[in-house]
Amino acid sequence: MSTVATTPKPDIHGAIRELWNHRAQDYDREPGHGIRTTREEWAWRRILAAAFDRVQTETPLRILDVGCGTGAMTMLIANMGYAVTGLDLSPEMLAVARDQAEERGLPITLMEGRADKLPFEDGAFDVVFSRHLLWTLPRPRKALGEWARVTRPGGMVAVSDGWWEEPGSEMRARRAIGGALRAVLERPSAASAAYRQLRPSLPLAGGLSPYSIRYYLDHAGLERIVVRDLKTIRAAERRSMPPWRWIDQARFTWIATGMVPE
């Protein structure tokens, strides 16, 4: 009796974990990753406070920062007075986050785990927040369903991301010029090559338009969806970017919020 050899499925989550492990030590130096200036910090504070104020509660909000990475947003949220838990796939990213939280004396819970397979009970949080995560996920719809599951009725899912590959001849030209300048002026990154290999497994690698994120949040069962342009964040980020990075900076980054039905 003959047997048919089967090809094992690639461990996509393991590959993603290794990519972010590799980037952990220098991740915050990238514009748009770490919060680099006071102007940027306060721009985020205003935006998040306006979003989270939509959630009614008599106690400090319980917030999950999913895909927290090195903890830049986790610590900002903690400094705003919220009870925050950070979760990330990468243990090296979490190690950086843990060191920074301890250095600042912030009471943050940090856990390793997958964004599409959360280790929490239904309704465990008032808010689930993510920044620059959705585009990195092999199963973004499943992840959004999980985020809605662990958010209590009347709570909020808040997603911040961007339209990284906005169509149109102008943006294609800007990306080409910006990429060429980075190739000359910046040290080549091994992570970039690893990302190119992963890209076919990431359905949202090019980002999402404001119309697309509305569809995804609606599909996850959320309601009262609001999408806000993050132009104040982009303006603050530019102040700490080298000039060649301005050229292909995404023209539309956003924060989208949706409420879990009561």
Predicted segment positions?
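Class I SAM-dependent methyltransferase SAM/SAH-binding core
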Residues: 62-66, 70-117
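Short alpha-helix
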Residues: 203-221
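A conserved beta-strand element that flanks and buttresses the S-adenosyl-L-methionine
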Residues: 129
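A short glycine-rich, Lys/Arg-flanked "PGG" loop and its adjoining helix->strand segment in the class I
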Residues: 141-153
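Conserved class I S-adenosyl-L-methionine
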Residues: 2-58, 72, 156-188, 231, 248
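Conserved S-adenosyl-L-methionine
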Residues: 222-233
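Core SAM-dependent methyltransferase catalytic element
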Residues: 220, 240-262
